[in-house]
Amino acid sequence: MKLLILIFLTNFIYAQSSKESVITVYKDGTALVKQQIVWNTVSKGESTLDYDDIPKSIHKDTPFISIENAQVLSQKFVEKVFSSDEYFLSKKGTPITVKLKNEKAVSGSLLEISSKRITIQSKYSVRSFNRDNIEYIETKDNLSNPNFSPYLSWEVKNNRAGKLKANLVYKLSNISWDAIYRLTTNGQTKGELVVEAVISNNSNKDYLDARINLVEGEINNIKTEQMNNYSKLSMSRSVAPQSASTELGDYHIYSAGGVKNFTSKENITVGIYGPLNVNYEKIYVFENFERQQKDEPLKVEYTLSNTEKDGLGIVLPAGKVDIYTSSNKGGFEFIGSDKMGQIPKGESSKIQAGYAFDIIGKRKVLNYDRQRKSEEAVIEIVISNTKSEPSPIKIVEHINGDWVIKEQSHDYIKEDASTIHFIIDVEPGKKEYITYTYRKEWK
């Protein structure tokens, strides 16, 4: 079905060009854009300036502008765009022409229009038509300057005729970034770490000749409605030089210096740090709760310490860690991934790679005695190491309430009011037995 409307355009002063932009990207899916724009020919005195090269996901309450040699009198954000449905709804009671498929056109006064039917009153009758059978609807109106996309408009007063340069600032959704770590392990203590940033432009706008900054840290935002959902993005990788973090008040900021063009539906990967030779602690963890009985492989856990002596001592953003291990053939294989929070200098983070095939933990409750005001349990834990090398083991036990430990076979460390752990080494091809009794009392 065609919609025939006669449209005449009059002159408005639209921006002739958009220059360099600076984009600050946050991890909550928003970004701040600082855009240079130019109007080449503007008359002296009061003028109306329009700019329509804006993304659909712009936060409409955020734009503000500064213009050289001009005073901004007012600003408006125009969202209304031409819609044939809205247009014809506004034409109820006025003459229209409906052309049916394989039939002559019918003219009359529009009574009703919906997604399924159109009803008109002709000279002698009222007729209702199925929209699927209509070839086109026609009105003889002349539309002056219909809007096809949202735009910003300013009333300005400038001191002289000629070119006007401006700096426009606004926020938008659907642009985000995240950190990706690639840790390649080589044995129990040493490996290589690469830190990259993946920047996603999920908006509908291309940013050309752009400088991109990445902010690490959680900012407070009033949630706004996401205006669009988009399909899968394309991927590209930049070989940009490494970027050091600088402070931005209470946050940290990284420069994605290798990015120039940031086009819609695109992911760009840029380097932040690395490759770095790092030290880590690898340990196998067996974690349990009170009367729980288990027989399962142990969790493989790596601890990264953000210190200079361990090859770091830098600001590490939160992100995903992909873990690889060196193979006997000189390559490497993927062995797991985990999420990691921000690691300030001097702090550490634990990363889980998966579960070990050759190290098994078995936990039994050998005896349990509950009285009216107390309970007591005897616990046995067996760790079997079928690997060809010694393995460090951490056994974590969670016990709630008012408890004491007695008759333990190994020394333990109390972590907090409900957690203890044992640290042991199990020789290759051996088993290690750990036993203890916990007693709880209450009034």
How would you name each of these model-derived features?
Residues 1-7:
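Sec-dependent signal peptide recognition
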Residues 3, 14-443:
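Long, intrinsically disordered, low-complexity accessory segments associated with secretion
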Residues 10-12:
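N-terminal signal peptide c-region/cleavage motif recognized by signal peptidases
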